[in-house]
Amino acid sequence: MRNCCLRQLGRIDYASALEIQEQLAASRKQGTAADHLLLLEHPHVITLGRNGHLENLLAGDDILERAGIAFFPTNRGGDVTYHGPGQLVGYPILDLRDWKRDVGAYVRALEQAIIDTLGDYGIEAGRIPKLTGVWVGERKIAAIGVHLSRWVTSHGFALNVSTDLSYFQYIVPCGLTKPVTSMAALGVRASLDEVGERFTRHFARIFDFEMLPGASLAAA
């Protein structure tokens, strides 16, 4: 069993969280840091993946500014997505050489951890063939977009817990016309801390981690 450091960052702006990811990823590549799982919540922000299309952003700068939504192009996979209050965001910084050198298996493992977490609340979630993310019927409840460099991961997932879904009106989520949903919209009331704790348990089981709290850990 390997060690993974859990860092709960609370509500943090996208740029600051990205800086933390980049610092940890650089240290992980150098072998001076352990694997990490960052759990957090963002203020309103729309991000565009490296393969994204601007036409899936349905609002101009003036509209986004009035709505209080920041915009960031990123190097993660996927298209356009929204992050905001009430959404559990997870950024694993992992060296997949210590697990499986298979990005597809990694994404499926993240999806499974989310599916199992939702199952704890009686929500029957699953996958849609050839699409990334976690779905309840035809509605997306969690988005996944990752980045790998020398087999070290960054970026990750966003699970709609009590997200205000009206903010998705400004985008075509992940470039798909399918609707979105949240745990709250499905009648489940839960705090981000509680959902994060349950996710962490499933994440640790699937990746065979012992989760250790703290700001930073040397590589095990």
Swiss-Prot record:
EC code: 2.3.1.181
GO biological process, one term: protein modification process
Record bears the keyword Transmembrane: no
Family matches, as CDD domains: LipB
PROSITE patterns noted in UniProt: BPL_LPL_CATALYTIC (PS51733), LIPB (PS01313)
Active-site residues (renumbered): C174
Ranges of residues in domain BPL/LPL catalytic: 31-211
Reaction(s) this enzyme catalyzes, per UniProt: octanoyl-[ACP] + L-lysyl-[protein] = N(6)-octanoyl-L-lysyl-[protein] + holo-[ACP] + H(+)
Record-annotated site: Lowers pKa of active site Cys: K140
Entry annotated with the keyword 4Fe-4S: no
Disulfide bonds: none
Signal peptide segment: none
InterPro entries per the UniProt record, alphabetical: aa-tRNA-synth_II/BPL/LPL, BPL_LPL_catalytic, Octanoyltransferase, Octanoyltransferase_CS
Top-level taxon of origin: Bacteria
GO molecular function: lipoyl(octanoyl) transferase activity
Class of this enzyme: transferase
Family listed: Belongs to the LipB family.
NCBIfam families: lipB (TIGR00214), PRK14345.1 (NF010925)
Full protein name: Octanoyltransferase
Organism of derivation: Solibacter usitatus (strain Ellin6076)
